[in-house]
Amino acid sequence: MGRVLRILAPNPGPFTLEGTNTWIVGADPAIVIDPGPSEPQHLEAVIDAAGSVGAILLTHHHLDHAPGAAWLAAHTGAPVLAARPELGEREVVDGAVIEAGGVSLHVVATPGHAPDHLAFLAEHEGWLFTGDTVLGRGTSVVDPPEGDMAAYLRSLEALLELRPRRLYPGHGPVVERAPEWLAEYLEHRRMRERQVVDALGRTKEPRSPAELASEIYAGYPDELLPAAARTVLAHLQKLQDEGIVTEDHQRFALAGPRGSNTT
């Protein structure tokens, strides 16, 4: 069985938690997942821990995950593999298998947090590298227009069907009770959607995502509310596509008899 090491990037924050997890998988040569920011001291620590590097994988293009890939590739000669061709030497797609360091990683497309988001499954070991689709603590932001709530929920369902034993997230601790955590993640998002619908149902006045977030996320730190409002917007756009809500100038109401607009 291969090894998994974590090198924590020095970019802590409200959304990155302790920082970005750079994962080193296998050995001689190792696979590096999400080099993180282009910070030489961090990337040198990755090389020191990895030894030889056979491939550099990106879960998605966001600035806390991908920029260090170019530096790491230049200093190791390893190819960068990503869903977006401009990010790497090779484009990888759902169902591809990447082998290095005694580990086979199956590529799983997981759009939602970002359109190019990938997860990587070591099927034999039961390891799932989730990027930002699932964090080790708290929940992930789904921020339109890149963030797509319908796609995100489908991705969570797909990961749950894989029945992994352990999750290695993009931020936060390793999750040992993987199926339970994935199920909780999925139910949490469904709960938030119900809360959005219920909040709209309490008034006939159209409401903005920020107004809804202030109610639904009451008690959350003020600095997190703008991101919460973006995730509420993602829920609203999904509900609008389903004909459950209507939108006028970024204000939303229930469609039909319960809302301010009737059909």
Regions found by a protein language model. Give the residues of each.
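Active-site HxH/HxHxD metal-binding segment of metal-dependent hydrolases
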Residues: 11-18, 37-106, 126
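Metallo-beta-lactamase
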Residues: 30-32, 37-39, 104-111, 115-199
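Histidine-centered divalent metal-coordination motifs
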Residues: 59-65, 113, 171, 235
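A short catalytic or substrate-binding loop motif that flags glycine-/basic-rich loops and adjacent residues
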Residues: 14-17, 111-114, 261-263
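C-terminal regulatory/interaction regions
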Residues: 199-263
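Residue-level signal for inorganic ion chemistry
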Residues: 3, 46, 171, 196, ...
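Conserved beta-strand hairpin/beta-sheet module of binuclear metal-dependent hydrolase folds
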Residues: 1-49, 119-131, 136
